[in-house]
Regions:
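Conserved loop-to-helix interface motifs that mediate assembly, gating, or partner/ligand docking
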Residues: 2-173
């Protein structure tokens, strides 16, 4: 039977752990709130950028760049599905929803699909199931840089321009 001192020590340790856990939750909630605010603040810029690019694309001669040309899908054409997930499981249902959306698109797609995987959880899920993968990017979320996004985009663009894919689909929850 533990002594009274041992019991008090254990109670104090549990209280300290609760205090640390509460502080960690508050920090995580603060980071999440800031990230959500940044996303909401970026929406007007993203929608305006989409309008500008759509306007430019309709006024420019499609022959000047291969991404502007409309292609008829070939019978053997594939679709590139880019699935974005986290590297850890500490993001609620984000990973699950993103993986489900990507898997559902692959199942419903009449064309053959190939994957571009961003994040460890997506790589692990689709890798275990033997899906065809064009590229993987893991570990980029610790310090997200423009260069990481540029590499992903350039890989997808190069494959599309080479004629490997007729269309592309991004999946993120």
């Amino acid at each position: 039977m533990p002594s009274l001192i041992d019991l008090r020590r254990r109670i104090r340790a549990v209280k300290n752990t609760q205090q640390i856990t509460k502080a960690m939750k508050m920090v995580a909630a603060s980071k999440l709130r800031r990230a959500q605010e940044r996303i909401i603040n970026a929406r007007p810029y993203a929608s305006q950028m989409q309008r500008v690019l759509s306007s430019v694309a309709t006024r420019v001669d499609p022959s000047i760049h291969p991404l502007l040309t409309v292609r008829e899908p070939r019978p053997d054409s594939k679709t590139l599905v880019i699935v974005v997930t986290g590297d850890k499981g500490l993001c609620g249902s984000f990973n699950t929803n993103s993986i489900k959306a990507g898997a559902a698109y692959i199942v419903e797609s009449p064309q053959k699909c190939m994957l571009g995987l961003v994040g460890r959880k997506g790589r692990d899920f689709f890798g275990r199931r033997g899906f065809a993968v064009l590229f993987e990017q893991v570990g980029i979320f610790q310090k997200l840089r423009y260069e990481d996004a540029r590499v992903i985009a350039q890989t997808a663009i190069d494959a599309f321009v080479a004629g490997d894919f007729a269309s592309r689909k991004a999946s993120a929850a």
